[in-house]
């Protein structure tokens, strides 16, 4: 009988691996896995490219003055109250506190030992996609799913807590976004999608084992800008489940609403994912980055210092309210935002103030109806749980009536840049410079999650840092003292902060290279869609090609 799936030997022809596969990873990166990667690439890459081209066309329209809005052609989906998402999946019913972080072994162990509901293992914003990081990350997740995880790091032993009766956080994997490629893996001479690669390797090796452990193949999907991008994922999910013999709907995907176009298409995104939908998440920093990026040609949409653009800002609050209303209407989770603070061990007063801000922020979210929130550090878990346990008595708030009547959210509500007391300060410019250069420097050293000024920063905050300065310079914004933010003024601040950063920097640092990337963006000389694509080639280690047939 014929099969829609070609033989493994045929599928791996044309596959080339341009990075080393260590012995401890060969059971994962085998012919069958790479054949699956190649099959998805050949079946779906053309559509990915079409969708990326659509992003460019949509940006051209925005540059011409056609601002983001609700789509008239999908109004019937938004207005149809009869459809909902699927029943909640095992391990994804109560998600009140989710910890996030990269996939290095220590992080995976610490996250799974935390008193949280889920752990989002990240191949995206908090991981530099160096080949070594990606391979080791897949090995770590393979072992995590099988509860076979330990490590000795700097003489200290780390073990997964397998105490009987203990809840081990549900594992959710975040693959890279549609815009990122994986240059270490070629299929028919073309680099594969980073997201498809991350998804395929994990899914093929661990989907069935995840089910055996009582959860399933669960994912977080980042940076989508159109509901058809969600449809592409849905089609990949259906094909993948058929490929390994799983029932459709076994996969579940939570979507980060972290772009301005996506906030106008939340109903449609849930609808496109259908039986695979597991809710929507508030991706604060990338959302602010997308706001600036999408509206960058328009001087009417200038934002103040990033420290002032909190979730209490009117346009950010509208975004959360609409997300909660939309998800609960469709019977899926409303997933709150990130608490990025890390403990300030040497200053009790500052640490207490930081934790009070976390409490206030999470109280706002749970009161608005959010079913969960993210933390970047285990020390914040008790703080967050105290708020959610007090104000959310059940496993979630999906079926509860809202505490306040929902007032329809308009295009103006979502786009208005008004922030009470808004101002741009020299301190804010300097902070953006320090964060941007420091993050890029760490990324170039293969570190994608970086503590800076007691906040855990990832690529999203670096994006905000560079785009804010670009916006201020490009449109001649003024500081609170009336000083026009010119290229010359920013150049002076750049030089001063760069000198401070390099004065006591450790040998082997990458500050010079980071400055070379950051400065042209901040000075308004160029604008890159993503800083991660701009600097990706610096962390690739392209080596001699290993044909798929020889794996």
UniProtKB/Swiss-Prot annotation:
Predominant place of localization: other
Active-site residues per Swiss-Prot or TrEMBL entry: 174, 458
Group of enzyme by EC: transferase
Protein's pathway: Carbohydrate metabolism; glyoxylate cycle; (S)-malate from isocitrate: step 2/2
Catalytic activity of the protein: glyoxylate + acetyl-CoA + H2O = (S)-malate + CoA + H(+)
InterPro entries: Malate_synth_C_sf, Malate_synth_sf, Malate_synthA, Malate_synthase_CS, Malate_synthase_TIM, MS_C, MS_N, MS_N_TIM-barrel_dom
Keywords, in A-Z order: Glyoxylate bypass, Glyoxysome, Peroxisome, Transferase, Tricarboxylic acid cycle
SUPFAM superfamilies recorded: Malate synthase G
Enzyme Commission (EC) number: 2.3.3.9
Subcellular localization(s) per the UniProt record: Glyoxysome
One GO cellular component term: peroxisomal matrix
One GO-annotated biological process of the protein: tricarboxylic acid cycle
Highest rank taxon of the organism: Eukaryota
Single GO MF descriptor: malate synthase activity
Protein biosynthesis listed as a keyword: no
Pfam families found in the cross-reference section: MS_C, MS_N, MS_TIM-barrel
NCBIfam families, sorted: malate_syn_A
Family assignment from sequence similarity: Belongs to the malate synthase family.
Note: There are two genes for malate synthase in C.tropicalis. The sequence shown is that of PMS1, PMS2 differs at a single position.
Record-given protein name: Malate synthase, glyoxysomal
Organism field: Candida tropicalis (Yeast)
